[in-house]
Amino acid sequence: MHLPNVLQARFVQALEPLTDSPSDYAGMIRPAADPKFGDYQSNAAMPLAKRVGKTSRDVAAELVQNLNVTDLFEEPEVAGPGFINLRLKDSVLFDSIQQMLLDERVGVSKTTDPKKVIVDFSSPNVAKPMHVGHIRSTVIGDCLARTLRFYGEDVVTDNHLGDWGTQFGIIIYGYRNFGDPAKVAANPVPELSALYRLTNQLIEYQKAKQSLATMADKLATAKSDAKTAKEVSDQSESDENLKPKDKKKLRKNAEAATRRVASIEADMKSLKAKIDAVDSDTELSKLASEHSDVDVAVLRETAKLHEGDPENLALWKEFLPHCQDEINRIYDRLNVQFDHTLGESFYHDRLAGVVDHLTTLGLTTKSDGAICVFLEGFDSPMIIQKRDGAFLYATTDLATLQYRRDEFQPDEILYVVDSRQGEHFKKFFAMAEPLGMAEVQLVHVNFGTVLGPDGRPMKTRSGSLIGLESLLNDAVSRAKEVVCNPDRLATMDPPMGGEEQQQIAEIVGIGAIKYADLSHHRTSDYKFDVDKMVALEGNTATYVQYSYARTQSILRRASDGEGLPAFEQAIEQAAATQPMTFTHPNERSLALMLMRFEEAIEQVRLNYAPNALCDYLFETAKTYSSFNESCRVLGNDDPAVMQTRLALVVLTGRVLKKGLSLLGIDVAERM
C-alpha cells in the first residue's frame, strides 16, 4: 500500500470545503521525523491558514474533523502551530506485512498504463578503454531501466556507441605508423588499446605544448587581477563609508580572483605533466618529433573513413568487433545489458537525409559555409554540417531521434548524459517540435562529475582519465581485505574457501562502486574514495549487503536444515493464517520501514533519483540492525512473537535484495 498516495486522496476530500484548490495542499504529507509525532505528518494547515484568514491550528482542527482516515490510522492529532500527526493502526501494519510476504513484487504495485520508454545510456567510444567518466551514465541508466521495468513500463535500452569517427582515425593512424600486424592479429584487444593510447598521447602532447604557450600570459593577467582585487578589498575594510555588504562583495571578488589563479596553475600543472611524460621518455620524445602533425594526420584518416575509403573501411570492420569485445567484458563485470547497441556508424548513411529534410522544411541557414539551424531563444545556432561537409554529433542525434520514433514509437526518451552537455540537449530538444515529435517526452537525465581527492575531475598524474577496469580491480581487492579478513573468516561455519571469498569480494567490490555513485544525488559531484566505498559502516553497499546476509544467517539457523525456500514458505503461510503481534517498538519501526519500499521506488521513477532508493535501503538496514540487537528472534518463548519476528526477517531480506537488484547490485548469502 502506497500510504502517501492514499492519504493525499483523503486530504483532497477534507480540503474541498476549505479551498477551491485542494490539490495544492493535499500533497504536503511526509513521514514523521520522530516517532513521537506519529508515522506521517501534514503541514497543509499552515500555508492554507494564510489564504483563508484563520489561525493554522483552527484550519488544522477543521481538516481533522473532515478527514476520513480512521480505517487506517488512529485519531489524527493537531500539534504545535498546526501540524496534523497520523499514526498507523497496528492492524494495518500487520495486514501490509502479510500481503508483502505473499507478493512476489514485495508490495510494489505495477502501473496500469505502461509507457514505451527508451533509456539511452553509457555510450562510450569503443576505440579506447572505458574510464572513470563512464561509470555514472552506465550505473544511473541501468538503475533507471531496471526500476522502470519493475514498475511495469515498456523499457527499451540503447547503448549509442561511439563506434565511428575520430577515435577510429586515431587507431587507424596508430596501426599504420606504429602497429605490428602480427601482434594485432594475435592479441587484438591489448594491442589496439596500446596503439590508441600511444597515438592519443602524442596528440595530447602537441595540444599541451600549444596550450601551455598561451597560458603563461593568462596566469600573469590572473595574478595581476588577484593582486589588485585583494588590495581593493583590504583597503575597503577601513573605509567607513562603505556598507558591510559592499565590503563582503569585494572580499568575494578577491577570493574568486585567487581561485582563478589556482585553477590556471592546476591546468598548467596538468599540461606540464603530459609534456613531461613524453619528453622524459627517449622513444616517445623521438616519436613526437617525427609525428608533429599527428592531429592533422588523424583527421585525414578519419575523413577517408567517412568517405568510404576501402582500406580504412576494411580496417574499421576488422578492429570494431575487438573493441566491442573489450567494453562488453566490462559490462559483464558490471552486470549491465542492453537491448540495442546502435552506434554512430549505424546512422552515418542517414545524416545527409537529415540535413536535406531540415532544409526542405525551411529550417536551415548557411553561415560561413556551414549549415545551421537558428533556434528561438538561443544565442548560437545548432550546426548540423560543417563547411568541409563533415557532420556533427547534433546531426547524429537528430537521425537517432527520427529512427527511434519510426522504429519504437516511444512515449519518452531518457538521455543519461553528464551536465556539461546541457546546452546541447536544450537545442536538440527544441528541434523535436518542428520535426513533428512534440508528443515524445525528451528528458536529459544529467549528472555531475567523479572527482579525485583534490576535488578536481579524477585523473592520473599525467592528466589521463583513470581506466574503469583498474578502479573495479582496486575495489574488489579492498573489498576482500574488509569482508574476508582473518578474524571474520575464523567465525564462518562452514569455513569459507578461496573461491567463495573471491566471489564475495567481486560482489562487494563492484557493488561498492555502483552504490557509491548512485547514493549521491545524480546532479552533484562526488569524490571517489574506495576505502569509504567498501566500509562496513555508513551508507555503503557493503553495509546493506551485510544486513541482507545477517537475515539469511538467522533464517538458515531457524530452518534447522529444512532449506530456506521451504522454510520461508512456511513463514508466509503462518503469517497469512496466524495473528501477528508487536511487543517492542523496534518491531513496529521495522514493519513501517518495510511498508515504505514502494514510496522509495516511486521517487526513483518520478525524479530519476536512484539516491532515494539508496537512502531507503540504508535506513532499512539501520532499522533492521536496531531490531536485531533488541528483539530476540530465535528461541523466543512466545511462538506468536517469534513468528512475527521471523516474518519481519524474511521480508527485510527480500526488500533489501530486491532494492539492491534495482540498483544493479548483487547480494552474498553470507559474509
Swiss-Prot record:
Bias-annotated ranges (Basic and acidic residues): 224-233
One GO BP: arginyl-tRNA aminoacylation
Region named Disordered: 223-254
InterPro entries: aa-tRNA-synth_I_CS, Arg-tRNA-ligase, Arg-tRNA-synth_N, Arg-tRNA-synth_N_sf, ArgRS_core, DALR_anticod-bd, Rossmann-like_a/b/a_fold, tRNAsynth_Ia_anticodon-bd
Domain of life the protein comes from: Bacteria
Keywords noted in UniProt: Aminoacyl-tRNA synthetase, ATP-binding, Cytoplasm, Ligase, Nucleotide-binding, Protein biosynthesis
Pfam families attached to this UniProt entry: Arg_tRNA_synt_N (PF03485), DALR_1 (PF05746), tRNA-synt_1d (PF00750)
Residue interval(s) of motif 'HIGH' region: 124-134
Name of the molecule in the record: Arginine--tRNA ligase
Record organism: Rhodopirellula baltica (strain DSM 10527 / NCIMB 13988 / SH1)
Protein encoded by which gene: argS
